[in-house]
Regions:
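Short Fe-S-cluster ligation motifs
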Residues: 73-94
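Short, Lys/Arg-enriched N-terminal segments with co-localized hydrophobic residues
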Residues: 9-20
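Short, basic/glycine-rich phosphate-binding loops at helix/coil junctions
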Residues: 54-60, 87-91, 156-159
Length: 178
């Protein structure tokens, strides 16, 4: 296991290639009554509590959530075609990476789901999309995403920085709150 160090305020994030986790192509997976969409392994954070640091999977059927490659929009649509969405309450963008890292794909898939399945859509996020894209992305989500769940994790910036270890450093906490 690699240690994460912070010399001179620089954050080093463990890369998937440095870990010994198995990879697969679990694009869609079920949690309770919801269908989850796993779009990427990329994340601007290295949270000390994140399951992906130590586990291949969080699903009951033991399928890995580490992706061999980022699925294309067409691959995701093909996965949707294989299942009956009537048994799910909502579609949730959440996997082993930050879903807004692939904002264009997320938006295209959300539009596809809205047009074809009329299911509520939620994004589970670290809340740093505006830093990732260097712009306010919230207008792009309007009409496509019904709920955004932001992982707050701590009540203050110092503790947040200590636990979340965002590559954006000190600006992350305030950006996540805005």
């Amino acid at each position: 296991m690699h240690d994460i160090k912070q010399p001179q305020g620089i954050i080093y994030i463990i890369r998937k290639e440095e870990c010994n986790m198995k990879k697969g192509m679990t694009i869609l997976y079920k949690v309770h009554n919801n269908l989850y969409v796993n779009l990427t392994n990329r994340c601007p954070c290295a949270c000390t509590f994140c399951l992906r640091q130590n586990m291949d999977t969080v699903t009951h059927d033991d399928q890995t959530l580490w992706l061999e490659h980022e699925p294309t929009v067409e691959e995701v649509k093909a996965e949707f075609a294989k299942i009956d969405l009537s048994e799910y309450e909502e579609v949730v963008f959440c996997g082993y990476g930050e879903p807004t890292e692939r904002l264009d794909a997320l938006l295209e898939i959300a539009k596809f789901v809205k047009e074809n399945y009329q299911k509520p859509i939620r994004i589970n996020t670290n809340g740093l999309a505006n830093l990732i894209w260097k712009k306010d992305v919230t207008p792009e989500l309007k009409g496509l995403v019904d709920t955004i769940s932001i992982s707050l994790n701590t009540p203050n910036a110092d503790r947040y920085h200590e636990l979340v270890r965002s590559k954006f450093g000190d600006q992350s906490f305030d950006a996540m709150l805005s």
